[in-house]
């Protein structure tokens, strides 16, 4: 017969006792109604049909939501989904930079040639800036990875580089006037040439270097889904900025009253560019908040494993006289607080990760586990089956000793007071005179581990300690793997090191030796991607830096060194202006292609998109040298935008995919962890390396050929070479070895 529920016995010590037959049943007079609500319908059947209790095994109740204190959870790696406007404002800096860069590429070569710079030397103007970028770009990237400014890691670099670009632009477009104010004459522009070259170097280096922290800024504050959208929006803004820049440069401002009031063509361009760059920089800096990085010496709050209670179980009967007596009402409220959820359900929904339980009762665990990385959770799940029994419940000799893992939340400090007859105790709680111990603690304590992998889920045994020696007095409670997760998920120290490893900077200080080691030990996939990126920029920069000169000399048959009143000089100026409109077509085609690139990625593979971009550019530059028809040459500019959009998007998207592999990202434990800022800088260094080679080769090549046709031939040939390399050598997917190993674990089949 099932005895009726009665008041708590006076000998109860910490938690109330129950009769053995009511092991899964809460006493009506001692427990809150919320506890009984957890009992499943099968347990209710058990109570309604006591004679059939041998054949109906009660289901264990579901665990509560994960009671993890919110202040101990580091949500730095969790990013909310960004809106379109946030991503748009975040990419505004690309609009301003490309607007400025359009002015530079359109007017640097004509301005320097008109000031008397020899043909053999004007290509070397582009040589100094890429040298500085190639040497300093990795250092800037590594520095930004470790920057501890309260404004964030990337935004201080964006601000400084934007200011540098504005100063360089001021010297570039006003160098001739400043030189005339110093000591230049109408036939000697040595000061003007020097100031213009300095402006080109500063402007080019700052504008190109600002791309890297802007990309890293977006990747830091966005999740994986928003990163692809952000890269496409960045390419879109870059294309629009270049397009509007070439539109402004292609207008004859000298013929307008506004241009005459400001002092000429270059003055109007300078005013437009300075305002655009300043406004877009401010919009980017205030777009999305950036979390500051903790200094190396600052100790972060350790996120220990939350004290996860077992599914609400009947309290364990303690021996009479063991410990201090506790009033029944106090013990009841204490147990109710232990068994009730103390954290609100997480608003996060499981989207990623292999740990998503099919048990609907594990809602809190699912939400908490899905908010962290898959590798972290899966590594903890494997520990479920490799760890040994660590806590034991000591019982009288008449009862078999069974292993149990009990984890209760700590009672608040205000609970321990003399009025309630309970004092704070450190360490295990001693019960009885025979030395038996009941350890009631949390998973925060260090626990020894046993070796070996179990081939089946472990079983938690909850003994029935209240009665005799029959088979039902030591009935085992079988708990499935999903329910054990509620007790052993988030194993303290190991989980903390895994969680903080990806978000905190490496303990190794920044040095040139460490940077060189990172470059030397570059993974093969990244090395091939860098080579392919180099070939793309080598072909593109050759066309971009000399396109307006190509239009003026080849298409319009002009001469930049002819007298200013001659027809040849006027033809050359008309060709430069028309070249600006050609670059405008290229820029808007890049913006359009960037807008549809996300849809194309759903239909075509990244390998195919790479192949199409290189092939289209090679055909476009090659056919431009074979035709003198202005409309044909301008229409071919659309192919240039396809390659530009590809170079601004796909390499960084592949790099993000590479970082999903633990093998590629490395580990802080063995010193192989890579930094996103450094690897983005390594990709960007290929742009500088390509510009260095263009500066060294294309000047003599143009002199040897006799026109700018040689530049277009060179760009077409390199583009076809990149087309082959992207198809044969680039790695587009790194197999996740770790994930495959975890999936082969038989234990995960019980989730």
From Swiss-Prot:
Catalytic reaction(s) noted: D-galactose(in) + H(+)(in) = D-galactose(out) + H(+)(out); D-glucose(out) + H(+)(out) = D-glucose(in) + H(+)(in)
Entry keyword annotation includes Flavoprotein: no
Residues spanning the membrane: 93-113, 123-143, 155-175, 191-211, 233-253, 268-288, 536-556, 576-596, 606-626, 630-650, 688-708, 710-730
GO BP annotations, alphabetical order: D-glucose transmembrane transport; galactose transmembrane transport
A single GO molecular function term of this UniProt record: D-glucose:proton symporter activity
Membrane topology according to the record: Multi-pass membrane protein
Main localization (coarse): membrane
Compartment(s) where it occurs, according to its Swiss-Prot or TrEMBL record: Membrane
Domain of life: Eukaryota
CC terms in the record's Gene Ontology section: membrane
Residues bearing PTM Phosphothreonine: 500
Keyword tags: Membrane, Phosphoprotein, Sugar transport, Symport, Transmembrane, Transmembrane helix, Transport
Primary role: Proton-associated glucose transporter in the brain.
PANTHER family the record matches: PROTON-ASSOCIATED SUGAR TRANSPORTER A, SUGAR TRANSPORTER
Record family assignment: Belongs to the glycoside-pentoside-hexuronide (GPH) cation symporter transporter (TC 2.A.2) family.
Name of protein: Proton-associated sugar transporter A
Species: Mus musculus (Mouse)
Name of the gene encoding the protein in the UniProt record: Slc45a1
